[in-house]
């Protein structure tokens, strides 16, 4: 089970975008994440009329290392760590380490 999943709200803890918050759009296989509004790059796009793509300079989100972000805890308004807890029925859930509240409600 992954500590950070799609649609989690995360905060960048190191790097040029330190302090920015965003939602995880995609989790890549090599411990990298695509987070909305974070790690914006400019890509020089070549036009492709067959696919209907206009050329020019476009801005898009680049992957960011998962170790450079932390999950955002709305109860404390701070970055938090993720722990796991077994429920009585045998399911494993993610919890915030600071207050023990479940992330997946």
UniProtKB/Swiss-Prot annotation:
Q: Please state the gene responsible for encoding this protein.
A: rplX
Q: How does the annotation summarize its subunit structure? A: Part of the 50S ribosomal subunit.
Q: Which Pfam families does the record cross-reference, listed alphabetically?
A: KOW, ribosomal_L24
Q: Name one GO molecular function term.
A: structural constituent of ribosome
Its recorded name reads Large ribosomal subunit protein uL24
The cellular component terms of Gene Ontology attached to this UniProt record, alphabetical and capped at eight, are: ribonucleoprotein complex; ribosome
Q: Which family does it belong to?
A: Belongs to the universal ribosomal protein uL24 family.
Function field: One of two assembly initiator proteins, it binds directly to the 5'-end of the 23S rRNA, where it nucleates assembly of the 50S subunit. One of the proteins that surrounds the polypeptide exit tunnel on the outside of the subunit.
The protein's superkingdom reads Bacteria
Q: Tell me yes or no: is rRNA-binding among this UniProt entry's keywords.
A: yes
Q: Which UniProt keywords apply?
A: Ribonucleoprotein, Ribosomal protein, RNA-binding, rRNA-binding
Q: Which Gene3D superfamilies is this protein grouped with?
A: 2.30.30.30
- What taxonomic lineage is listed for the species of origin? Bacteria, Pseudomonadati, Pseudomonadota, Gammaproteobacteria, Cellvibrionales
Which GO terms fall under biological process for this protein? translation
Signal peptide range equals none
**PANTHER family xrefs:** MITOCHONDRIAL RIBOSOMAL PROTEIN L24 (PTHR12903)
InterPro entries in the record, alphabetically?
A: KOW (IPR005824), Rib_uL2_dom2 (IPR014722), Ribosomal_uL24 (IPR003256), Ribosomal_uL24_CS (IPR005825), Ribosomal_uL24_KOW (IPR041988), Translation_prot_SH3-like_sf (IPR008991)
Checking SMART domains in the record gives: KOW
């Amino acid at each position: 089970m992954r500590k950070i999943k799609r649609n989690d709200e995360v905060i960048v803890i190191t790097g040029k975008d330190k302090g920015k918050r965003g939602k995880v759009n995609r989790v890549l296989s090599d411990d990298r994440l695509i987070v909305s509004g974070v790690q914006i790059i400019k890509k020089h796009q070549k036009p492709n009329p067959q696919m209907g793509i206009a050329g020019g300079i476009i801005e898009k989100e680049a992957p960011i290392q998962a170790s450079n972000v932390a999950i955002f805890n709305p109860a404390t308004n701070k970055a938090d760590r993720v722990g796991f807890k077994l429920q009585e029925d045998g399911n494993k859930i993610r919890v915030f380490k600071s207050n023990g509240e479940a992330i997946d409600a």
